[in-house]
Swiss-Prot record:
Gene Ontology BP, a term: mRNA transport
The protein's name in its UniProt record: Protein RAE1
WD repeat start-end pairs: 23-62, 70-109, 112-151, 153-190, 244-283
Keywords of this entry: Acetylation, mRNA transport, Nuclear pore complex, Nucleus, Protein transport, Repeat, Translocation, Transport, WD repeat
Principal location listed in the UniProt entry: nucleus
UniProt-listed InterPro entries: G-protein_beta_WD-40_rep, WD40/YVTN_repeat-like_dom_sf, WD40_repeat_dom_sf, WD40_rpt
Lineage: Eukaryota, Viridiplantae, Streptophyta, Embryophyta, Tracheophyta
Motif (DWD box): 128-144
Gene: RAE1
Family annotation (SMART domains): WD40
Segments of this protein annotated with the region Disordered: 1-21
Amino acid sequence: MATFGAPATANSNPNKSYEVTPSPADSISSLSFSPRADILVATSWDNQVRCWEISRSGASLASAPKASISHDQPVLCSAWKDDGTTVFSGGCDKQAKMWPLLSGGQPVTVAMHEGPIAAMAWIPGMNLLATGSWDKTLKYWDTRQQNPVHTQQLPDKCYTLSVKHPLMVVGTADRNLIVFNLQNPQTEFKRIQSPLKYQTRCVTAFPDQQGFLVGSIEGRVGVHHLDDSQQSKNFTFKCHRDGNDIYSVNSLNFHPVHGTFATAGSDGAFNFWDKDSKQRLKAMSRCNQPIPCSSFNHDGSIYAYAACYDWSKGAENHNPATAKSSIFLHLPQESEVKAKPRVGATGRK
């Protein structure tokens, strides 16, 4: 309990989530679950890519550290091959590594850019790796070849990308959203100005490939449909705000079974939403640090999220003595993530 006159100490784990150990030594930049098993990969600013095996017995969770690899500089992003055998990672050393995790093989460099690699995705239908960089290019890689299959010029630095074959959405600086139909990957399908007024932080494609979500630094999410006849279904909503304090939306994840989605933000909270009934299903308690990244496991029974300093307030506000980086696992209740009709309303914009 707080002493009278002294501020209460914010809780680092107010949702009583399971903590994965050991924690990375520096801020966590991405979390990716295997599409086939409960194996979690984290990338971090201490140049590391780490892997844990997660096991569950009823409501109890356990984690076992399995392996790790190093980059030469901070690692920013990660992706899994669709068969769950291989992890890809990229970052400030301007290269992407392929790590044959399940076979115990050594990592090899499979992609190079002229600037940091900010985002990546494996494209299952094409057996290609897509990498997006601050060098204003998107590259497609056949991992057996030294040179990219194709280099696509982007209008600005790549910040984020998402693939749900055949749909790919790329978010760049200056609020550009570039949509690709991967059946014709060398041509832009559509270029859209973000429906949000501020810098794009994250995008994720709809599971049915009919559109995408976009999150911005101004505590807002846009729900966007690609078909011109569906534009009336587009809307934006505010989230990750506390009075006049507005926080970045850092991560968007669709639930693999229910089609609802999670947002995570720099306010330290994660929430579950239903875009079709336009309602929040569950608001979780705020951690005392930002949540920069998150991931559902393959069946949506586990939601992983990181809590750590996100550098949004600069180096001068970073206190290494108190800024612990943590990875937590939350077990979503069905009521938190299952879609439900909005009672007595037609939907709120």
